[in-house]
Amino acid sequence: MFFKLLKDAFKIKQVRSKILFTIFIILVFRIGTTITVPGVNAKSLEALSGLSFLNMLSLVSGNAMKNFSVFALGVSPYITASIVVQLLQMDLLPKFVEWGKQGEVGRRKLNQATRYISLALAFVQSIGITAGFNALSSTKLVAAPNWQTYLFIGAVLTTGSMIVVWLGEQITDKGYGNGVSMIIFAGIVASIPEMVKGIYEDYFVNVPSDRLQSSIIFVACLIVAVLLIVYFTTYVQQAEYKIPIQYTKIAQGAPSSSYLPLKVNPAGVIPVIFASSITAAPAAVLQFLSASGNDWGWVRTAQSLLATTTPTGIAMYALLIILFTFFYTFVQINPEKAAENLQKSGAYIPGVRPGKGTEQFMSKLLRRLATVGSLFLGFISIIPIIAKDLFGLSDTVALGGTSLLIIIATGIEGMKQLEGYLLKRKYTGFMNTTTK
C-alpha cells in the first residue's frame, strides 16, 4: 500500500515537488548535525554516552546532541516554548487568550511569541549544557572555558536551533507532515543502523560462545516484540471513534446523516515528545550540579527520584505523558468550537441537545479518548524502560518504544496527509470533468 501510494504521488508534479522538498529539508538538517560547534571537542562526550538524560536529549534533538553539532539543541527549546504558550492561553494571560480566539491573525501572533520565547530559552539552555557537559567531561569539552567562549558557543547553538525551527516550519508549510515531528523522525531513522550495530555487538560479538544460543533466542524475541509494537501502534494510531450526526432540513445540500470521526488517540505522539523534553531538562541540571564538585545531598536524592532508571523516575515520566495527552487532546479539539461549528452547519448529534449539551458531550468523550490514548502512549514508552532494568538491556533498547512511537505516528500522519491530498485531487478532477 505504501509503495503504491508513493508511486501514485510521484506521478503528480505538485505532490512530487512537496515530497522532494521535504526530503531536501531533512537532508539539510542531517548535514547540519554532522558539523561540530567550533572550539568544542565532541569526542569527550563519548564517555558520557551511558547517561540516560543524554540519550533523551539526543532523541528530542533528532540525534544531533551526541556529537555536539550546531543543531545540538534541535527543536527542544521550541517544544518547551510551545508548551508555555499553550498554557498561557488557558485563561492565564488575557492577551494570549484573546489571540487564541482571533483565528489566523491570532495564530500568527502566538507563533511569533513562541519564537521569541524559544530564542531566549535556546540561549540559556545552550550556555547551561555547554558548561554542564564541560564539567561532566572534566573540562575536556571546551578548550578555553571562559565567558567569551561560552557566549560564542551559546550564539552558535541558539542560531542553529532557530534554523532547525525554521526548517521544521518549511516542512509544515510546503512539505508533508508536522515539521517538528519530521525533524525528530529523521534523526531517529538515521540512528537505526547504529542501533542495530549496537545490538549485534552486545548480543553476538561481545558474548562468550556458550551464551550465543541464548542471545539468538533473546534477539528473536526482541524482533517479535518490535513487530508487535509496530502492529499495535499502527492499529491504535489509525483507529477512529465515529460520532453519528444528522442534519436539519435547513442545511441545504447537506446529507441527511453522516458521522464525525475522532481519533482514538487524538493527541498523536506529541505528548511523548513533550514528556521526553521536560524529563531531560531537570535530569541534565541535576547531573551538571553533581559534577560541580559540591557534595549536595539534595542533588543526589533528586537524581535518584527523577532518573528514568528508578521506579519514581519512570512513574514521573508516565505521569507527564498522561498529563500532556489530556492537555494536548483539548488543544487539538476544542469542545466549545466543535459544538459551535456543528450548530452553524445545521448538524446535531442524535439524543444530544445542540450548543451547551453538545459541548458537554464532546468534553466527556474527549476525556475518555484521552484516557485510552494516555494509557496506550504510556504503555509503549514505559515497557522498554522497565525491560531494560529487568534484563540489563542497553539504553538504545530502552528508548526503542518511544522511538518506534515517533517513527510510526509521524509516518502515518505523512501518509494520511498524502492520501488525503490525492483523494481531494481525484475528486476535484472528477468534478471538473463532469461539469464540462
UniProtKB/Swiss-Prot annotation:
InterPro entries: SecY, SecY/SEC61-alpha, SecY_CS, SecY_dom_sf. One of its GO terms (cellular component) is plasma membrane. The chain crosses the membrane at residues 19-39, 68-88, 116-136, 151-171, 179-199, 216-236, 269-289, 313-333, 372-392, 395-415. The keyword Cytoplasm does not apply. Keywords: Cell membrane, Membrane, Protein transport, Translocation, Transmembrane, Transmembrane helix, Transport. GO terms for biological process: intracellular protein transmembrane transport; protein targeting; protein transport by the Sec complex. HAMAP family: SecY. This is Protein translocase subunit SecY. Component of the Sec protein translocase complex. Heterotrimer consisting of SecY, SecE and SecG subunits. The heterotrimers can form oligomers, although 1 heterotrimer is thought to be able to translocate proteins. Interacts with the ribosome. Interacts with SecDF, and other proteins may be involved. Interacts with SecA. Its main location: membrane. It is a multi-pass membrane protein. It comes from the Bacteria. It comes from Streptococcus gordonii (strain Challis / ATCC 35105 / BCRC 15272 / CH1 / DL1 / V288). Belongs to the SecY/SEC61-alpha family. The central subunit of the protein translocation channel SecYEG. Consists of two halves formed by TMs 1-5 and 6-10. These two domains form a lateral gate at the front which open onto the bilayer between TMs 2 and 7, and are clamped together by SecE at the back. The channel is closed by both a pore ring composed of hydrophobic SecY resides and a short helix (helix 2A) on the extracellular side of the membrane which forms a plug. The plug probably moves laterally to allow the channel to open. The ring and the pore may move independently. The gene is secY. It is found in: Cell membrane. The lineage of its organism: Bacteria, Bacillati, Bacillota, Bacilli, Lactobacillales. The keyword Membrane applies.
